[in-house]
UniProtKB/Swiss-Prot annotation:
Primary role: Binds to the 23S rRNA.
Name of the protein in its database record: Large ribosomal subunit protein uL15
Family to which the UniProt record says this protein belongs: Belongs to the universal ribosomal protein uL15 family.
Record's compositionally biased regions (Gly residues): 21-35
Length: 159
């Protein structure tokens, strides 16, 4: 059996009905749309219109807001950095946000890159990032490396 030999099971599909092609077809004249009214017209769909009933998007309350000071950070795990170093696309002695983007480890730096602890830390890794989790910093330092965090530290109130 090949992909080009596959076909639907017998009786599982119906032929498409061509409507509005004469009274004898059974779906002529009004073409299954009934008589007059908004639904009989072409271009009927008005997005969000529910026939005069208060639409769902107006019945429900507005919620939340977008914080003006929020940061949209990219993130990278230690395991992903270790793979890139093994593949030879990253130099473990000097890893920066620019080198992570250039090596394809992170697609975009956005408002900075945050280092997370999933995976094993490579030996003697020296990395400079905007943010890092406590577990990631501990893992890198335990493996004999160092982490430099350039971003502002979190406020005590935020933790």
């Amino acid at each position: 059996m090949k992909l080009n030999e596959l076909s639907p099971a017998d009786g599982s599909t119906k032929k498409r009905m061509r409507v509005g092609r004469g009274v004898g077809s059974g779906k002529g004249k009004t073409a299954g749309r009934g008589v007059k009214g908004q639904n009989a017209r072409s271009g009927v769909a008005v997005n969000g219109f529910e026939g005069g009933q208060m639409p769902i998007y107006m019945r429900l309350p507005k919620r939340g807001f977008t914080s003006p000071g929020s940061k949209n950070m990219s993130w990278v795990n230690l395991g992903r950095i270790a793979k890139a170093i093994e593949a030879g696309t990253l130099d473990a002695s000097n890893v920066t946000e620019e080198s992570l983007v250039a090596a394809g480890v992170v697609r975009k730096a956005r408002d900075g890159i945050r280092l997370l602890a999933k995976g094993d830390a490579p030996q003697k890794l020296t990395i400079t990032v905007t943010g890092a989790s406590k577990a990631a910093v501990e893992a890198v330092e335990k493996a004999g490396g160092s982490v430099t965090v350039t971003g502002a530290p979190k406020d005590a109130a935020e933790e």
